[in-house]
């Protein structure tokens, strides 16, 4: 999303799937060319990424299918640092889909976001396979669904591993749920470790948010770090479509997050020109100020309270649940949860829902934050039923993606316990949105 005025160092690389190293002729050994940190010319980008893009059911460009609509648009701050993905038939499991949006920040945030987009689903799939085979899962479910239940409609797993529970109800298939939850937590942990080891992506002062979701039948498991958000469109008792926020915006001033940050000697305060935006700062340096408490990358802050452990929540879907919207803060800063649900519901076709959200957010940015540049936007709308009356032909064309003029030419390259009132995050009202990651000015905050 934003930019970082300080940058340094880099971190490790993923092994190439194909190709062999160049062998120079006899005589003087040829020195390998230097690679700028954060360069897109990494071995992963050149070999593994094209293979990923040919996987059936994996989508990362503007487009739609019968049940999903994706759309991203570059803002006015530089490269589009937002990324998104939908992977149908994920993990070779029937009626299973993986969705995610990622909001990069810092000088190489666009690269970090796309790297996480590409690798995190692979790590999650690997952990799912290591738990148990699909056949064993079905056998286990058939043996245990009658007597093994989880209390509550929504189960929330906090950073310390303790569970918090909301909306009392009974949920079957405990083994399947625990498998999904455990796999998401492990995948996030290994993803951050891999970023730290990579030499071709500078993640010291660059990183990304992530909100990901696995839908397996009627089971919905969401993992979240940062301030991207997932919102459910659900019918209330009056049959009115209302928003239900599935994730919590993990800002530094959230009490549980602030307690951890202060315990790790990180500082939390807002700048004078954006008093409602709390930031995480190093204890003795005037940079960087990160407007979130959890993120992939940003290793300069990892010893001072920033973590990559996801908040994981579970929900058992019902017939009243109509769609889920995953989006970066370019959407949520400009639109309330209620507005987002209304726009999706009123879209002429499901395939146009993602574009409609982005266009509405851009319009709102121009009057809500007139002194700020429009932010990047990325949105995934997943519809939870299969009604065909609002569907249109799926569209995934490289030409459309590029000719729109709204996104980069990429192919070659918790939870609230009650429905949201639609008022949005109060700390954003009247604030000029600047950057996710900034340097501290010459002044420092006064002591309380």
UniProtKB/Swiss-Prot annotation:
Domain named PPM-type phosphatase is located at 67-384
Q: Molecular function terms in GO for this entry?
A: metal ion binding; phosphoprotein phosphatase activity; protein serine/threonine phosphatase activity
Q: How many cofactors are bound and how?
A: Binds 2 magnesium or manganese ions per subunit.
Keywords, sorted A to Z = Cell membrane, Hydrolase, Lipoprotein, Magnesium, Manganese, Membrane, Metal-binding, Myristate, Protein phosphatase
Q: Where does Mn(2+) 1 bind?
A: 103-104
List ligand-binding residues for Mn(2+) 2: 103, 329, 375
Listed cofactors? Mg(2+); Mn(2+)
Q: Which reaction does it catalyse?
A: O-phospho-L-seryl-[protein] + H2O = L-seryl-[protein] + phosphate; O-phospho-L-threonyl-[protein] + H2O = L-threonyl-[protein] + phosphate
- Where does the record place the region Disordered? 1-48, 401-431
> Top-level EC class, please?
hydrolase
Q: Where does the UniProt annotation locate this protein?
A: Cell membrane
Family per similarity comment: Belongs to the PP2C family.
Identification of the protein by name: Probable protein phosphatase 2C 74
Q: State the species of origin.
A: Arabidopsis thaliana (Mouse-ear cress)
């Amino acid at each position: 999303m934003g930019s970082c005025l300080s940058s340094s160092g880099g971190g490790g690389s993923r092994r190439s799937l194909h190709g062999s190293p160049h062998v120079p002729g006899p005589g003087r050994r040829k020195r390998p060319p230097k690679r700028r940190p954060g360069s897109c010319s990494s071995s992963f980008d050149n070999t593994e990424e094209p293979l990923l893009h040919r996987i059936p059911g994996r989508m990362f460009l503007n487009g739609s299918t019968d049940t999903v609509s994706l759309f991203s648009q570059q803002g006015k701050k530089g490269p589009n640092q937002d990324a998104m993905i939908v992977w149908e038939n994920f993990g070779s499991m029937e009626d299973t889909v993986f969705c995610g949006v990622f909001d990069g920040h810092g000088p190489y945030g666009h690269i970090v976001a796309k790297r996480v987009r590409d690798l995190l689903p692979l790590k999650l799939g690997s952990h799912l396979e290591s738990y148990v085979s699909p056949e064993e899962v079905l056998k286990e479910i058939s043996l245990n669904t009658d007597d093994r239940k989880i209390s509550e409609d929504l189960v929330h797993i906090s950073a310390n591993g303790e569970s918090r529970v909301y909306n009392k109800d009974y949920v079957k298939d405990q083994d399947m749920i625990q498998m999904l939850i455990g796999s998401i937590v492990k995948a996030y942990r290994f993803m951050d470790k891999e970023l730290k080891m990579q030499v071709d992506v500078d993640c010291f002062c660059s990183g990304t948010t992530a909100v990901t979701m696995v839908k397996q039948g009627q089971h919905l498991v969401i993992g979240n770090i940062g301030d991207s958000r997932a919102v459910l469109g659900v019918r209330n008792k009056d049959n009115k479509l209302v928003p239900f926020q599935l994730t919590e915006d993990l800002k530094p001033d959230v009490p549980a997050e602030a307690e951890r940050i202060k315990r790790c000697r990180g500082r939390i305060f807002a700048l004078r020109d954006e008093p409602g935006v709390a930031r995480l700062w190093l204890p003795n340096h005037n940079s960087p100020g990160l407007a979130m408490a959890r993120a992939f990358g940003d290793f300069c802050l990892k010893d001072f309270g920033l973590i990559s452990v996801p908040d994981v929540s579970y929900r058992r879907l019902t017939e009243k649940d109509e769609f889920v919207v995953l989006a970066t803060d370019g959407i949520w800063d400009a639109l309330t949860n209620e507005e987002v649900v209304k726009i999706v519901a009123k879209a002429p076709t499901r395939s146009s829902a993602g574009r409609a959200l982005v266009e509405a957010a851009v319009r709102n940015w121009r009057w809500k934050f007139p002194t700020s540049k429009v932010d990047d936007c990325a949105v995934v709308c997943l519809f939870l039923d299969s009604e065909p009356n609002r569907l249109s032909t799926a569209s995934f064309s490289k030409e459309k993606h590029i000719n729109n003029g709204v996104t980069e030419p990429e192919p070659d390259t918790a939870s609230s316990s009650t429905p949201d009132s639609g008022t949005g995050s109060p700390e954003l009202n009247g604030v000029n949105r600047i950057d996710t990651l900034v340097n501290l000015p010459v002044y420092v905050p006064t002591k309380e």
